From Swiss-Prot:
Classification via SUPFAM superfamilies: P-loop containing nucleoside triphosphate hydrolases
Gene Ontology CC: cytoplasm
GO molecular function: ATP binding; pantothenate kinase activity
EC number: 2.7.1.33
Disulfide bond entries: none
KW Ribonucleoprotein (keyword) present: no
Family per record: Belongs to the prokaryotic pantothenate kinase family.
Classification of source organism: Bacteria, Pseudomonadati, Pseudomonadota, Gammaproteobacteria, Enterobacterales
Record's catalysed reaction(s): (R)-pantothenate + ATP = (R)-4'-phosphopantothenate + ADP + H(+)
Keywords associated with the record: ATP-binding, Coenzyme A biosynthesis, Cytoplasm, Kinase, Nucleotide-binding, Transferase
GO terms classed as biological process: coenzyme A biosynthetic process
Name the UniProt record assigns to this protein: Pantothenate kinase
UniProt source species: Pectobacterium carotovorum subsp. carotovorum (strain PC1)
Amino acids binding ATP: 95-102
Record PANTHER family: URIDINE KINASE
Length: 316
């Protein structure tokens, strides 16, 4: 099969790093190096070059899509003869644990909010819609946290449905990675943002991923543009272990940390436990529930070493 035939056989346009970077088209970099340092994750090297070459072209593309969506809404309002109702544009970001979804979400939030249109951009993670630990323990699901059955999907779907219905005030629960649990009485209130970035393992999942909990509507039904952050599993496991080691030296040393007992481990013991957690929980969840959703994404960013994006695939 020729390269042209291969290109026609896929629903994606593929760009290497330099091809994608060229699509920036003189969009100015509005983030300083100090601001970028604050946006990156605990185990990531996020450089000015990465933001300029990968995230600026992406923010330019998203700005085009969002503007097009607003024009479509205006056409519908003109047809119906109604006053404009503000309907947020939802960007979904999916991918494995440790791949850097949160950094991608934070960078896009910062860039999109600084476009000349000055749109309001909110960021919500689906972690807040995990069942509380009390419920997970009752259902013997603590070792399945992040798997489809560990989420309160009805609440998550209602949340995105309310957002897309133009509800003026919508609340979302928050999750603490320190206590490894939902934070009681600490809901985040969203008041009709222009853009909602929804980040989580499960934003691209659909009915086939929830046979235990049949319902007809899913988060992916409400997402306008979806991004899957991808990387080879060998890298993902390495990044997960390295992140675990950094947490052991930092967050785990906090007496309030759910994983405080891990702070006393030797490095060899910590690597062993992190490897086991990857094999039994995160790697398994990746293979069974996350990776199969990759080809549902509007755009796939594939990372190489040091979290540098080497390839971008954009749905035609």
């Amino acid at each position: 099969m020729s390269n042209r035939e291969q290109s026609l056989a896929t629903p994606y346009l593929q760009f290497n790093r330099s091809q994608w970077a060229a699509l920036r088209d003189s969009v100015p970099l509005t983030l300083t190096e100090e601001e970028i340092v604050k946006l990156k994750g605990i185990n990531e090297d996020l450089s000015l070059d990465e933001v300029a070459e990968i995230y600026l072209p992406l923010s330019r593309l998203l700005n085009f899509y969002i503007s097009s969506n607003l024009r479509r809404q205006a056409v519908l309002e003109q047809f119906l003869g109604t006053d404009g109702q503000k309907i947020p544009y939802i960007i979904g970001i999916a991918g494995s644990v440790a791949v850097g979804k949160s950094t991608t979400a934070r960078v896009l939030q910062a860039l999109l909010s600084r476009w000349p249109e000055h749109r309001s951009v909110e960021l919500i993670t689906t972690d807040g819609f995990l069942h509380p630990n009390k419920v997970l323990k009752e259902r013997d699901l603590m070792k399945k946290k992040g798997f489809p059955q560990s989420y309160d999907m009805h609440s998550l779907v209602k949340f995105v449905s309310d957002i897309k219905s133009g509800t003026h005030k919508v609340t979302a629960p928050t999750y603490s990675h320190l206590t490894y649990d939902i934070v009681p009485n600490n809901n985040k209130v969203l008041e009709q943002p222009d853009i909602l970035i929804l980040e989580g393992l499960n934003v691209l999942q659909s009915g086939m991923d929830y046979p235990h909990d049949p319902h007809r509507v899913f988060v992916s039904d409400f997402v306008d543009f979806s991004i899957y952050v991808d990387a080879p599993e060998t890298l993902l496991q390495t990044w997960y272990i390295n992140r675990f080691l950094k947490f052991r030296q930092g967050a785990f040393s906090n007496p309030n940390s759910y994983f405080h007992n891990y702070a006393k481990l030797t490095e060899e013991e910590a690597v062993g436990i992190a490897s086991q957690l990857w094999k039994e929980i995160n790697g398994l969840n990746l293979k069974e529930n996350i990776l199969p959703t990759r080809e549902r994404a509007s755009l796939i960013m594939t990372k190489s070493a040091n979290h540098a994006v080497e390839c971008v695939r954009l749905r035609k």
